[in-house]
A protein has these predicted regions:
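Phosphate-binding loop of NTP-binding sites
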Residues: 17-20, 40, 54, 65-210, ...
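Short polybasic amphipathic segments
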Residues: 248-254
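Short linear Ser/Thr-Pro motifs
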Residues: 10-12, 33, 64, 156, ...
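Short coil/loop residues immediately preceding or within conserved phosphate-binding loops
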Residues: 99-101, 247, 259
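ATP-dependent carboxylate-amine ligase
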Residues: 1-45, 57, 61, 79-82, ...
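Short amphipathic alpha-helix with an adjacent loop that forms part of the alpha/beta core around
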Residues: 50-57
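Short acidic/polar mixed-charge low-complexity motifs
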Residues: 149, 232-234, 256-260
Length: 265
C-alpha cells in the first residue's frame, strides 16, 4: 500500500499498524518531519514531494481527505486503475481484524476519554492497538500497535469519517451543532451519530451520556443495547463526588451497588 501524506498525525500511525501487520508500505509527504524520519527508521520508504513515480508497484493507495484528485499520485492511481481509499476506510478495514473495537465519539471530550480508556485497558493487560487524536504521555505518542484483540479509536464525525468504522462498542459523549461547514444543522449532525450507533453489530453495545439531551434524543428508539452513564442518573453513575486539591473522586454505581471507587490524578 502507498500512503499519500504519510507524515500526517493520523496517517503515520496507520502506516505503523499496517507495517506491523506485515503489509509492504511506502509513502510520500510534502516535507521532512520527525514522523517521516520515524517511519523510515522502521524500514518504510518515504519520498518527499508528490510524483506519479512514487506509486511504484503499490496495489492500493490510501489518502486523507485533504489530498484531492488533482494530486499527481492520486491521478496516476486513477489512471492505472489502482483502488484509492480514504484514511477512515483503511482504519475501518483494520478494525475488522479485532474482536473488540471501542470507538469513542462526541463533539467534545473524545481525546481525553480515549486516553483514559487506553490507560484502563492497558492496566488490564489487554495490549490494545490505539489511535488517539493527541499525544498520550503513557504512550509517548498518539498511537500504539498492540498484539491483543482490542482496538481503541478516537472516532470523529467530521465528513462522516466514523461511518467507515466497525465498532463493537460505540461511545457517544455528547452531540452539538459542530462542523457546520460539512453538516447542514444540528439535525444533520444527529443523523450522522444515529447512523454511527446503528453500525454496532449484534452482541455489541452503545454507551451514551445520559446527561446530554441531544445524545438521548438521537438514540430514541435505538434497537441496539444502550448503556447510559451520567453524574447522577444513568445505568452507571457517580455518587459521593468530592474534590481534593482540584482533583475529583467518586464511587461508580452500577446496578444500584458500588462497583468501584475512582480517583482522578
Amino acid at each position: 500500500a502507498h500512503l499519500v501524506g504519510i507524515g500526517g498525525v493520523s496517517m503515520s500511525p496507520l502506516a505503523e499498524v499496517l507495517h506491523g501487520a506485515g503489509m509492504v508500505i511506502t509513502g510520500s509527504d510534502m516535507r521532512e518531519s520527525p514522523a517521516v524520519e520515524h517511519l523510515r527508521s522502521l524500514g518504510i520508504p518515504v519520498a518527499v514531494g508528490h510524483r506519479a513515480e512514487n506509486l511504484g508497484d503499490a496495489e492500493l493507495v490510501i489518502r486523507t481527505a485533504a489530498v484531492h484528485d488533482g494530486n499527481p499520485e492520486i491521478a496516476a492511481a486513477h489512471d492505472k486503475g489502482i483502488p484509492v481509499f480514504e484514511r477512515a476506510q483503511a482504519w475501518g478495514a483494520i478494525m475488522r481484524g479485532y474482536q473488540h473495537a471501542l470507538c469513542i465519539s462526541g463533539t467534545h471530550g473524545k481525546t481525553t476519554t480515549t486516553s483514559m480508556c487506553t490507560h484502563i485497558i492497558m492496566a488490564a493487560g489487554l495490549d490494545p492497538t490505539v489511535m488517539i487524536g493527541g499525544t498520550l504521555p503513557l504512550l509517548g505518542a498518539g498511537h500504539r500497535v498492540g498484539k491483543g484483540d482490542t482496538i481503541i479509536l478516537e472516532s470523529c464525525e467530521y465528513c462522516n469519517s466514523f461511518l467507515s468504522f466497525f465498532p463493537t462498542i460505540a461511545v457517544i459523549l455528547n452531540i452539538e451543532a459542530d462542523h457546520l461547514d460539512f453538516f447542514k444543522d444540528l439535525e444533520d449532525v444527529e443523523r450522522s451519530f444515529r447512523r454511527f450507533a446503528d453500525l454496532v453489530p449484534e452482541g455489541g453495545r452503545v454507551i451514551a451520556n445520559r446527561d446530554d439531551a441531544n445524545t438521548m434524543a438521537t438514540l430514541a428508539g435505538e434497537t441496539r443495547p444502550v448503556t447510559t452513564f451520567g453524574l447522577e442518573e444513568g445505568d452507571i453513575h457517580a455518587a459521593g463526588l468530592r474534590w481534593d486539591k482540584g482533583l475529583p473522586s467518586f464511587d461508580v454505581i452500577y446496578q444500584r451497588e458500588v462497583y468501584a471507587h475512582v480517583s482522578l490524578k
